Amino acid sequence: TTGSCAAAAAIAAFRKLKNPILEDFNRNIHTVLPSGETIEIPCQSVSGTFSDEKIEVSATVIKDGGDDPDVTSGLPIVTTLTLNLAEAKQANNAPVQTPETWEFVFHGGPGVGTVTLPGLGLEVGGPAINATPRQMIIDNLRNCIRYYYRYLPNAPIHVTISVPGGEEVAARTFNPRLGVVGGIS
């Protein structure tokens, strides 16, 4: 699914985030699905920028629709993780986040639609990233964070999902009639 591709890309991006000098990486990403099943999803690329102000890492997975392809098959699904170091909470001002309490802020990048009507279970004006994929991304990131959170800045992780080509493909879906404009959900 698009959500499992976004989750796999989030895992690959996190690996780069925790190890910036990582040049080669395991391209088969073990991703836990909502059912608890673990699947391997190949990751195409990972890149990152690291500065005193922020850490930003992106990973790309090409969606393979398998036996049940849809209009999104073959599209790149890009997950970008951003830590804005200015948002880091000082130890004396806020409790240190744990894997279970870590804050994630979701954003829709290019090719991800914006919700314009109520009734989808998503915030009107927000990105069309459905609840199940959001939770799958959070659960997989929490699994990653579990081993490294003591070494991360105590700041929210911004998760941006982008789908280059998503805006064009969305025109061939029911999304516009459901109130999702500008991309896929």
Model-inferred region functions:
Residues 1-182:
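Generic N-terminal targeting/processing segments that precede catalytic cores or assembly contacts
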Residues 185:
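Alpha-helical metal-binding/catalytic segments enriched in His/Glu/Asp
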